[in-house]
Structure formats: C-alpha cells, structure tokens
C-alpha cells in the first residue's frame, strides 16, 4: 500500500476539496492516461486495485505511471464508541482529487489495448474520469 514513510504530524484536518487541478493535469510520461473530471478522494487500496487490473490486462507489456500519492491520513473511531475521548486513529491514507488531475499514464502498448486496460481501471475509481491521449489532451475537462 502507498503511504508516506513519515509525516510531521500524525493526523490532519479534513479540509475542503475545491477548484480545478492545474498541477499534474498534463501527460508528462506516457501517451495515454486517465484524467479525473469531478472532485473525489482516492485511497491507497483503490490506487493499487486499479493498477493491478491494468497491468494484468496488458500482460506486463509497456509501462504504467501512477501520478497520485495518498499523503493525507483519514481517521475513524472504532464502532460502538461513545462520542468524545479524542480523535480516532489513522484508518487509511487518501489524496483529494480535483477535476483535471491525471491519475495514471501508460506508454509502449497499442492504443486499443491501453483503452481497454484504462477502462478496467476507471471502474475501480470512486469518481468520474475520462481517457485522454496526447492529441485530446488540450480539451477542457
């Protein structure tokens, strides 16, 4: 699972997920990728399950880049616990996703096969996404 090696503070506040993503919005490594078109939150398990689905479909040909990293701790209190007594423990690591953010990139394989693999990965993600290529990259969200 993806998570930071160490952080300055164990727990963070929730914050707000607003606006569009300008950093990490363009293809930098591959020829085709998945771009988020709505706000959401992705955790390390979702990132990993989508990656596994893609790599199994392409039979380890080509290369896959993960463009997101879950660096925000999400806390939860145990079930049937009364209110109070402090904030719960860290349950999982997440990353807030804004529209326009690239999630995965691929290179070195046929575009039709890459589209099939990325469609499998899209079904594992908890927000709406679209497949972009280097030609369609300049389209707005």
From Swiss-Prot:
PANTHER family: 50S/60S RIBOSOMAL PROTEIN L16 (PTHR12220), LARGE RIBOSOMAL SUBUNIT PROTEIN UL16M (PTHR12220:SF13). HAMAP family: Ribosomal_uL16 (MF_01342). The keyword Ribosomal protein applies. Part of the 50S ribosomal subunit. It comes from Helicobacter hepaticus (strain ATCC 51449 / 3B1). It comes from the Bacteria. This is Large ribosomal subunit protein uL16. GO terms for molecular function: rRNA binding; structural constituent of ribosome; tRNA binding. Binds 23S rRNA and is also seen to make contacts with the A and possibly P site tRNAs. The keyword Transmembrane helix does not apply. Belongs to the universal ribosomal protein uL16 family.
